[in-house]
Curated annotation (Swiss-Prot):
Biotechnology: Malbrancheamides have the ability to inhibit calmodulin, calmodulin-dependent phosphodiesterase (PDE1), and induce both endothelium-independent and endothelium-dependent relaxant effects, suggesting their potential as vasorelaxant agents.
SUPFAM superfamilies linked to this entry: NAD(P)-binding Rossmann-fold domains (SSF51735)
Lineage per the UniProt record: Eukaryota, Fungi, Dikarya, Ascomycota, Pezizomycotina
Residue sites binding NADP(+) per the record: 12-17, 40-44, 61-62, 82-84, 140, 163-166
Name of the protein in its database record: NmrA-like family domain-containing oxidoreductase malD
Family membership: Belongs to the NmrA-type oxidoreductase family.
Organism whose genome encodes this protein: Malbranchea aurantiaca
Record keywords, A-Z: NADP, Oxidoreductase
Amino acid sequence: MDTGKRLVTVFGGTGNQGSSVVRSLLAHKDKLFHVRVITRDPTSEKAQACAKLGAELVKADGFNKSETVSAFMGSWGAFVNTNSDEEIYKIPGGRSDYDLGSTVLDATKEAGVKHVVYSSGLNLCKYTNGRVHSEGFESKYYVEQYGRRKGFQTFTPIVPASFMEAFLAESFCQSLGGFPWFKRDTGEYLLATPPYGGDERMPWVSVEDDFGDIVHGIFLDPDSYHLKTIQGSSELISFEKMVEDFMEVTGEKARYVRLKSWVDIPLDGTSCREEMRAIFHSMYSNGGKWFVPDESEIDTATTLKKEAKLAQGVTDGSLTAFKDWIHKQWERRLPN
C-alpha cells in the first residue's frame, strides 16, 4: 500500500458529514492525510473551524466547473457530499442537486483524482414501484450512478443511515411524539412511529462520532471498496429498544406507541413531516430495508471504524450505540 502523504479534498467539508471526515482524517497518528476543504466562504465560522484543525481552505463554487477543477488539483482522493436541501433547488426550472453533484464529479475526474468516496442516497421511487418519491434522496442516487461510469481508479458510494443527530432537531422530535426532549402533559416522553418493517430494527449513524471514521477506513484501503456500496451505520435498533435505552441512561419515564400506518404521522405543513411519511412508507414497503435491495448490516462499518481508530492510535474502535449517544447528549444538556 502507498505510504506517501495523501491529499484528500473534501467537498461539503463544513457540513455534518464532511466535517466529521475532516476531523477523522486529520487525526491520523502518522499524519498520512493532508486535508483540503472546498468552501464558498472561507471566512465562515464552520470553515474556520476546519482550518483550526489543520485543513487547507480553498474557495470555489461547485457549479463553477473551472473553479472546482482547480480546487481539486493535486488531490489523491476526494470525499463529496452535496446538500440536497439548498433553497436554490426549490426554484422551478432552476439548478438541481444532480447538476451540482455531476459537475463536481466531472471536476474531480478532470483534476486527476484517483479515489472518490461519494455520499449517496436511496432510490425510494424505484424500490416502491413509483409509490414513494423523494427528490433529495433520489438525486444523490442518480449522481452515484453517474460516478460509477466515470472511470475513477476507485469510486465508493456510502449511503448514510438515519442520523442520530436528527433527534437534536425539534421538528424531527415533534413529528414522532416529542421524544427525547419534549415531555407530554403526563410527565413522560413519547416516541410514536408507524411500523418500520422487517425485524423493526432501523439503521442509525452518529455522524459526529462514526461517519468520518468509516470514510477514513475506506481511504486507508480504497481498492478493497471499489464500486461497493458502504452502509454508513452505527447501530441497528428498534424504536422500542431506543425508549428502553433512554430510560436506562436518563432515569426518565418514556413510552413507545406504534401507529397503525405512515399516514398516521400528522402533517403540519412542513417538509419534515412529508419526508417522515415517505421514509416510513418506503421502508415498510421494502420489508425494513434501508439500503434496499440489500439487508442492513454493520459488519463493514465495524471493520472500517476499527481500522480508522487504529490508524489514529486508538485501540477502542467501537461504533456508537444509541444508548451511548443519547447519554452523551443528555449530559450536554444538564445544567452545570
